[in-house]
């Protein structure tokens, strides 16, 4: 038969799975949104960078026009530096009519981010912008302006910092919302798991799952509680049936008295207790006189009524600690434990015999009388085992029945007369003695 796979603890819990899922979704969403915004921003900056670079080149061409006309390199450099230093320009060069460099300006490479700015400008900005310098409609030179990646780098760094901050805030928000959601989902599931574990380990079918705040989980809890109701009812019926079967296995169905197996087990325990506490006990072997005659003459129903009444009358003469059992047919056995003396056993036997003096009323209104013959064996005087005690009490009962029906007899240890009569009984025919 396939064994059910058990949880080993290596799998992640539902709580952790939900936390990871919520955090992952939130981070992916923020990262995707941040990346999209950054790309759109870069494209927008690039779209504005080209016209701005052309405006800067045109402004420089107007400013250095006079210096180019007169070939004044110093004035051209001063004008060039004045404009380029305040704009997003990495370099600017002024050429004369012959294409020779008249003036140039380059932004100083300060800081570790200069190379990164150059790389961004190379990747994202267009080629350097060239603007002719005109005088009276004639080209007298040109200006070459190369853009700087400083703005792009600042934008990227600001966007990255903002995205990291958003990711942190999103992670905190996702953790908080996940805890609330997990509390609503995992909490009821934990309760259900605890109840199921308690029911499985302790067989406590009275446990119930509390109502959840989510409809589906609440329905699951109701179905689980309904299942527990059925299991509790089934368990109760099973216990009742087991108790009934156990009672039937150890009790006589007619008289409801314990049977021979139950009596012998109880006698064995009583002997151990008596030996441990040095106490005395007695076994009474009881047989109904002329029961076969009553059963044959009046029928089995009358015989059953007689047996039930005998059981009730014997039980009525005993203490709560004593035990009476039906061994079979019309034979009964009584365990008297503890016992103060053998005289108490004789007195109880006399009371049982006396209880049978009143006639037994049958179902048809008629009455019938019977008597009981009792054999008594004492522990430890006569025997110290269950079988030996029952045997000695049985032998004493048969001897008493031969001598006088409706009497009682105490087994006697090593009594020659008892031994002789016991031999006669053992050698007699299998037919039971008259009752």
UniProtKB/Swiss-Prot annotation:
<dbReference type="InterPro" id="IPR029787">
    <property type="entry name" value="Nucleotide_cyclase"/>
</dbReference>
<feature type="topological domain" description="Cytoplasmic">
    <location>
        <begin position="1"/>
        <end position="22"/>
    </location>
</feature>
<comment type="pathway">
    <text>Purine metabolism; 3',5'-cyclic di-GMP biosynthesis.</text>
</comment>
<dbReference type="GO" id="GO:0007165">
    <property type="term" value="P:signal transduction"/>
</dbReference>
<dbReference type="GO" id="GO:0005886">
    <property type="term" value="C:plasma membrane"/>
</dbReference>
<dbReference type="InterPro" id="IPR043128">
    <property type="entry name" value="Rev_trsase/Diguanyl_cyclase"/>
</dbReference>
<dbReference type="Pfam" id="PF00990">
    <property type="entry name" value="GGDEF"/>
</dbReference>
<dbReference type="InterPro" id="IPR000160">
    <property type="entry name" value="GGDEF_dom"/>
</dbReference>
<comment type="subunit">
    <text>Homodimer. Interacts with YfiR.</text>
</comment>
<feature type="transmembrane region" description="Helical">
    <location>
        <begin position="23"/>
        <end position="43"/>
    </location>
</feature>
<protein>
    <recommendedName>
        <fullName>Diguanylate cyclase TpbB</fullName>
        <ecNumber>2.7.7.65</ecNumber>
    </recommendedName>
</protein>
<keyword id="KW-0472">Membrane</keyword>
<dbReference type="InterPro" id="IPR003660">
    <property type="entry name" value="HAMP_dom"/>
</dbReference>
<keyword id="KW-0021">Allosteric enzyme</keyword>
<feature type="compositionally biased region" description="Basic and acidic residues">
    <location>
        <begin position="413"/>
        <end position="426"/>
    </location>
</feature>
<feature type="topological domain" description="Periplasmic">
    <location>
        <begin position="44"/>
        <end position="154"/>
    </location>
</feature>
<keyword id="KW-0460">Magnesium</keyword>
<dbReference type="Pfam" id="PF00672">
    <property type="entry name" value="HAMP"/>
</dbReference>
<feature type="binding site">
    <location>
        <position position="288"/>
    </location>
    <ligand>
        <name>Mg(2+)</name>
    </ligand>
</feature>
<comment type="function">
    <text>Part of the YfiB-TpbB-YfiR (or yfiBNR) system, encoding a tripartite signaling module that modulates intracellular c-di-GMP levels. The system is a key regulator of the small colony variant (SCV) phenotype, and plays an important role in biofilm formation and in vivo persistence. The c-di-GMP produced by TpbB/YfiN stimulates the production of the Pel and Psl exopolysaccharides, which promotes surface attachment, generates an SCV phenotype and confers resistance against phagocytosis.</text>
</comment>
<keyword id="KW-1003">Cell membrane</keyword>
<feature type="domain" description="GGDEF">
    <location>
        <begin position="279"/>
        <end position="415"/>
    </location>
</feature>
<dbReference type="GO" id="GO:0046872">
    <property type="term" value="F:metal ion binding"/>
</dbReference>
<dbReference type="GO" id="GO:0061939">
    <property type="term" value="P:c-di-GMP signaling"/>
</dbReference>
<keyword id="KW-0479">Metal-binding</keyword>
<dbReference type="InterPro" id="IPR033417">
    <property type="entry name" value="CHASE8"/>
</dbReference>
<feature type="binding site">
    <location>
        <position position="330"/>
    </location>
    <ligand>
        <name>Mg(2+)</name>
    </ligand>
</feature>
<dbReference type="Pfam" id="PF17152">
    <property type="entry name" value="CHASE8"/>
</dbReference>
<keyword id="KW-0808">Transferase</keyword>
<feature type="domain" description="HAMP">
    <location>
        <begin position="183"/>
        <end position="236"/>
    </location>
</feature>
<comment type="function">
    <text>Catalyzes the synthesis of cyclic-di-GMP (c-di-GMP) via the condensation of 2 GTP molecules.</text>
</comment>
<dbReference type="GO" id="GO:0052621">
    <property type="term" value="F:diguanylate cyclase activity"/>
</dbReference>
<feature type="topological domain" description="Cytoplasmic">
    <location>
        <begin position="176"/>
        <end position="435"/>
    </location>
</feature>
<keyword id="KW-0997">Cell inner membrane</keyword>
<feature type="transmembrane region" description="Helical">
    <location>
        <begin position="155"/>
        <end position="175"/>
    </location>
</feature>
<keyword id="KW-0342">GTP-binding</keyword>
<feature type="region of interest" description="Disordered">
    <location>
        <begin position="413"/>
        <end position="435"/>
    </location>
</feature>
<keyword id="KW-1133">Transmembrane helix</keyword>
<dbReference type="GO" id="GO:0005525">
    <property type="term" value="F:GTP binding"/>
</dbReference>
<feature type="active site" description="Proton acceptor">
    <location>
        <position position="330"/>
    </location>
</feature>
<keyword id="KW-0812">Transmembrane</keyword>
<keyword id="KW-0547">Nucleotide-binding</keyword>
């Amino acid at each position: 038969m396939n064994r059910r796979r058990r949880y080993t603890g290596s799998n992640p819990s539902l709580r952790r799975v939900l936390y990871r899922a919520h955090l992952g979704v939130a981070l992916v969403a923020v990262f995707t949104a941040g990346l999209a915004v950054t790309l759109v921003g870069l494209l927008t900056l690039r779209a504005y960078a080209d016209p701005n670079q052309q405006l800067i080149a045109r402004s420089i061409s107007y400013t250095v026009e006079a210096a180019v006309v007169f070939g004044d390199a110093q004035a051209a450099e001063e004008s060039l530096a004045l404009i380029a230093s305040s704009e997003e320009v990495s370099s600017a060069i002024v050429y004369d009519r012959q294409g020779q460099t008249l003036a140039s300006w380059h932004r100083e490479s300060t800081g570790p981010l200069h190379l990164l700015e150059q790389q961004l400008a190379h990747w994202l900005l267009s080629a350097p912008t060239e603007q002719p310098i005109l005088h009276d409609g004639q080209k007298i030179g040109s200006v070459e302006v190369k853009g700087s990646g400083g703005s792009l780098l600042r934008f990227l760094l600001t966007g990255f910092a903002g995205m990291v901050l958003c990711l942190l805030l999103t992670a905190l928000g996702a953790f908080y919302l996940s805890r609330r959601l997990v509390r609503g989902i995992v909490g009821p599931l934990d309760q259900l798991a605890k109840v199921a574990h308690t029911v499985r380990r302790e067989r406590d079918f009275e446990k119930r799952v509390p109502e959840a705040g989510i409809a589906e989980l609440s329905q699951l809890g109701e179905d689980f509680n309904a299942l527990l109701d059925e299991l509790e009812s089934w368990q109760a019926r099973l216990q009742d049936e087991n108790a009934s079967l156990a009672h039937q296995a150890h009790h006589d169905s007619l008289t409801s008295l314990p049977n021979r197996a139950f009596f012998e087990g109880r006698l064995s325990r009583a002997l151990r207790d008596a030996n441990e506490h040095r106490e005395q006990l007695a076994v009474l072997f009881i047989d109904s006189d002329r029961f076969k005659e009553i059963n044959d003459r009046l029928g089995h129903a009358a015989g059953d009524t007689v047996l039930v009444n005998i059981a009730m009358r014997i039980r009525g003469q005993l203490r709560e600690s004593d035990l009476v059992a039906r061994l079979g047919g019309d034979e009964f056995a009584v365990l008297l434990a503890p016992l103060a003396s053998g005289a108490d056993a004789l007195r109880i036997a006399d009371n049982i015999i006396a209880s049978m003096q009143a006639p037994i009323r049958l179902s048809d209104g008629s009455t019938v009388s019977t008597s009981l013959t009792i054999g008594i064996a004492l522990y430890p005087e006569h025997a110290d085992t269950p079988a030996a005690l029952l045997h000695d009490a049985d032998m004493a009962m048969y001897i008493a029945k031969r001598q006088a029906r409706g009497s009682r007899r105490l087994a006697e240890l090593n009594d020659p007369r008892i031994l002789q009569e016991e031999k006669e009984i053992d050698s007699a025919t299998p037919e039971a003695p008259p009752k």
